[in-house]
Amino acid sequence: MLKITDTYNLKDIYDFQLSFKTPYFFDVSFDTWKKSFEDDIDGEGRELFKELFVKAAYDNDKLVGFVQYGKTAFGFADNGEISSDISYPVIRNLYFKEDRAEAGELLLNEAMQNLGTKKRVYAFFHYFGMTCFARHGKLFENNAHIDALLKEYGFEVEHKNVYYSSVLSESKNSEVMLTANGLTKGNQQYIDFKIDGNQVGGCEVHYLNDTTAYLRWIYVNGDIVGKGIGTKCMEALKSFLYEKGINRFDTDTAIDNTVAQHYYEKNGFIREGVTGSYYTKQEN
């Protein structure tokens, strides 16, 4: 018999979520996953949620789905600045077996009722994903049954991104020098690229574990774009990370940013698929 409950075995949810084939569901320990699931922070150490709830769907004591939802601890003003005066109702995680659509419906209905429908509700909000999964909050493309259910409930796609992964190997580039700043509370690092002592660009790297890192963003100065400097910076960055023991290096970019897609693919990143975030039509 199917039942929805807030009494659940957290290890069941850990195993269940990792059973979904997603390129950014890295092989993480239960303790690492639990920290991200229950009490997560962003790269600067800010708590992501001020309240967070979980409902699980069991059929004869077997987990067939779960939903995690709540209200964020901050949001983004029109100018992009972070503000603690803004909070979003977010469905952070929603996973259920493909052949158990009724479980997904019950879970989503439970979340929507508790979040309220007067304000816009977000699902798979990119920024508020789990740190152990590179805080890539979007839903991977192979979950068509989840996508379909969200759309049945009035959600529409907000943004789509292309997810990339690369395997690092030893490479040398002596022309570009790196200046790395200290790690943030969220284990991220700002790095400057320099040639002949002059800064030509920069990036932000998130270290997920001893062997895996994630590129948040990268840029080169506008006046040197198209001169091959970006490729040299990436070569230097990969060499720097490889020497630190990193062998997997992932990133993502907007689906309509074809320039960035070309850059990543030119520099050895493999396209893994498309991810999406969602929202309802109600305005905040």
Language model regions located:
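Conserved GNAT acetyl-CoA-binding A-motif
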Residues: L115-K138, L241-D252
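Conserved acetyl-CoA-binding loop-helix of GNAT-fold acetyltransferases
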Residues: D99-G116, V220, G226-S239, E243, ...
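A short, internal acetyl-CoA/4′-phosphopantetheine-binding micro-motif in the GNAT/acyltransferase core
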Residues: S83-A103, I218-G226, T253-A254
